[in-house]
C-alpha cells in the first residue's frame, strides 16, 4: 500500500530518478544514486535502500557486500515528482571509499572565491 501511494506521486517517464540519501539524525547528505520503479519498490518493501546501477545495469542493495546498510526512516518527494530524498539510519560508511559521506571533498568560499 505504501509503495502505491508513493508511486502515484512519482514521475518515472525519463526512466531513472535521482535519490538523495541523507542521515536522519544529523541531516548530513550521504550519497546520491539512481532508482527506477522496481528499486523504489524494493526500498519500500524492505526498508533498506536499493538502487539501479547505471554502469552494471543491475540492482544493488546498499550494504549487501560491505555490511554498511541504510535503514529507511522516511522518503520525501520533490515538487516535480522526479527526485526523492531518503532519510536513513546509516550503518558504517555510505561511500565506497570508506568515507561516511560521498561528499567528503568540499570547497569553502570566502569573499567570492574558493579558499
UniProtKB/Swiss-Prot annotation:
Mg(2+) binds at residues 78, 80, 82. It comes from the Bacteria. Its cofactor is Mg(2+); Zn(2+). InterPro entries: PRA-CH, PRib_AMP_CycHydrolase_dom, PRib_AMP_CycHydrolase_sf. Zn(2+) binds at residues 79, 95, 102. Pathway: Amino-acid biosynthesis; L-histidine biosynthesis; L-histidine from 5-phospho-alpha-D-ribose 1-diphosphate: step 3/9. Keywords: Amino-acid biosynthesis, Cytoplasm, Histidine biosynthesis, Hydrolase, Magnesium, Metal-binding, Zinc. Its EC number is 3.5.4.19. SUPFAM superfamilies: HisI-like (SSF141734). It is found in: Cytoplasm. It holds the Pfam family PRA-CH. GO terms for molecular function: magnesium ion binding; phosphoribosyl-AMP cyclohydrolase activity; zinc ion binding. This is Phosphoribosyl-AMP cyclohydrolase. The gene is hisI.
Amino acid at each position: 500500500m505504501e509503495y502505491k501511494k508513493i508511486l502515484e506521486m512519482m514521475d518515472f517517464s525519463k526512466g531513472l530518478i535521482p535519490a538523495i540519501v541523507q542521515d536522519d539524525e544529523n541531516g548530513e547528505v550521504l550519497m546520491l544514486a539512481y532508482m527506477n520503479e522496481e528499486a523504489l519498490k524494493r526500498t519500500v518493501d524492505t526498508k533498506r535502500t536499493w538502487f539501479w546501477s547505471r554502469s552494471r545495469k543491475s540492482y544493488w542493495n546498499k550494504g549487501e557486500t560491505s555490511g554498511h546498510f541504510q535503514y529507511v526512516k522516511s522518503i520525501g518527494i520533490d515538487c516535480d515528482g522526479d527526485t526523492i530524498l531518503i532519510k536513513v539510519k546509516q550503518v558504517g560508511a555510505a561511500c565506497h571509499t570508506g568515507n561516511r559521506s560521498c561528499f567528503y571533498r568540499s570547497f569553502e568560499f570566502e569573499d567570492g572565491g574558493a579558499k
